[in-house]
Amino acid sequence: MLTSERSYLRYPKNRRWTEAGRFWAPHPENVLFIHKPTMEETRRVALGLRSQLVRNRERKTKAHLLSLELDRLVQVHDSRVRVINADIDAVKQMIGNMTWSDNIDMPQSRSHEPPLVTSPPQASHRNFTVAIVPGDPHFSVDRDLRGELMPTLYMNQNQWLPSFGPWFISLTDNAMQRRVFPKELKGTVNFQNSTSLKLISHTLTTVASTTADFFADARHLTDTQAALCLVNAYFCQKTSRQLPATPDDLLADLPQKLDLLITQLKQESGPGDFSFTYSNPQERASLAPLNKESRYPTAFFQRHKLHAMMAKAGLFPHNKGTGAPGTAPAMDLVFAITSAMFGSDIPPFSAYQWNLRAGIVALEVFILAYGLLEFGQVARGHPNRRLNLVSLLGPKFQPGALPDPNAPMLKRGQLFSFISEHYIIPTLQANPNAPVSFIFPGIILAALEARSTVSHKQPGPFVNLTGSRFNEIFEILNQQLTFRDPLALLQARTALRLATEEGLDVLLSHPSPPTLLQEIIKSQFGGGDDYDRAYFMVLGCLPVVLAVV
């Protein structure tokens, strides 16, 4: 091999750049220059164009959706107009087919005769009559027995004033000492061991509306209606009676239905009490289930004896795992009653548990009311009696209506049967939406007082001097008359209702609930016998005459 050939193989020849290679090759003269103002202006124009395109697209989308909604409204309106026109045509056809008689002489109006009033006054249809105790006179009521009775007690303020017992005296003193309290409720008579008419009226109104619904919902029943559905379903399940067919059937034989329920409840020996179980602290901020659900958590009713007894009887067949084998009815009795009485808008209690909770709490109030007067007697001239209607009502009280001293003893449950027939039924017939707190405000007050003493574990009697037991009531009055904050008012009413539920649990969990009730009524409200207890249960207070010094 030649020397030149070896050099060629060992050292390749240097390649030369092509025209394209020379263009892209690095060179000090190749400089990239960016003009910042031009780029900013380009960016601004591009963003403006993009925003305009987005707005145009959004405007077209909204216009399209609006046109669809308008088309739907036109279709709905057109269908409704067709229905209305069809009804009008049917009415016209019926009127055209009617036969008119020319022999009827229409009375001619005379100018000298006044026109006849063919309809009674508007308020007369609300007037009804109630009675509390056998032998006492009946009371003609327009709307509210308490609201119409209280003003009559303040007719002679220069001679005497009503006093309502230690609980109301303590409430009045505590209200006068509060820095924030509605001025219109601070009457001059508050400093004379009495309570002003405005303060006692607002307090009783607040207590009477404790269990009333905060808002309207087509699925809601009042707590009284829910309780009546529950007790009737349980009674029909245990006795194989026919389901109630009319609203009057719901109220018929109410003492017998409550007696059966209480008898079965006393036989329940399992663990538990009458409280609801809160697994989340936020559940106490609202009565409705959290997260807009229709059911409470599984453990919410777990400890409640009344719910457990009804579930064991098979009243809630939609709840899995409840009810003894072979005890469940062929259908949901509670749902059958609500559908027949209140329409198809009311869902089953097991599916929409707001009504279940409200009904159980109202049923607890009915149980306490029945137990308090189960063996009640109203003999004339009891030495420890506080209420004296003769001194309170004066000439309005008919002397001939006084109870007969030779009247026979009342049988077991007869006093509550009288109240059921002459007070509960007329009240619910006149006001079907009345909550149970409106019917028995005295039980609500006793429950609130029982709750305030539950934390005091004393071996003997004691006097509660703290003002914390009035906080829920005062907060509602402040929000209604002073601050007027709807959200705060809702929270205050929720707190009062929760406090009532806790107080009912304290009363029913006591070894002898009627005995504890009697002690509270006697020590805090002055009730000395069954006559006083019956009136306190209905009025929420026991006024007596107090001379003005």
Swiss-Prot record:
Outline what the protein does.
Answer: Capsid vertex-specific component that plays a role during viral DNA encapsidation, assuring correct genome cleavage and presumably stabilizing capsids that contain full-length viral genomes. Participates in the interaction between the capsid and the tegument through interaction with the large tegument protein/LTP.
GO CC term (a single one): viral capsid
Chief site of localization: virion
Q: Does the keyword Chloroplast apply?
A: no
Q: Tell me where on the tree of life, at the top rank, the source sits.
A: Viruses
HAMAP family (UniProt xref): HSV_CVC2
Query: What InterPro entries does the entry give?
Result: Herpes_UL25
* Family membership noted in the UniProt record: Belongs to the herpesviridae CVC2 protein family.
- Region annotated Interaction with major capsid protein/MCP, chain positions: 1-54
Supply the name of the protein.
Answer: Capsid vertex component 2
The UniProt keyword set, sorted, is: Capsid protein, Host nucleus, Host-virus interaction, Viral genome packaging, Viral penetration into host nucleus, Viral release from host cell, Virion, Virus entry into host cell
One of its GO biological process terms is: viral penetration into host nucleus
On assembly, the entry states: Heterodimerizes with CVC1. Interacts with major capsid protein/MCP and triplex capsid protein 1/TRX1 at the pentamer vertices. Interacts with the large tegument protein/LTP.
Q: Where in the cell is it found?
A: Virion; Host nucleus
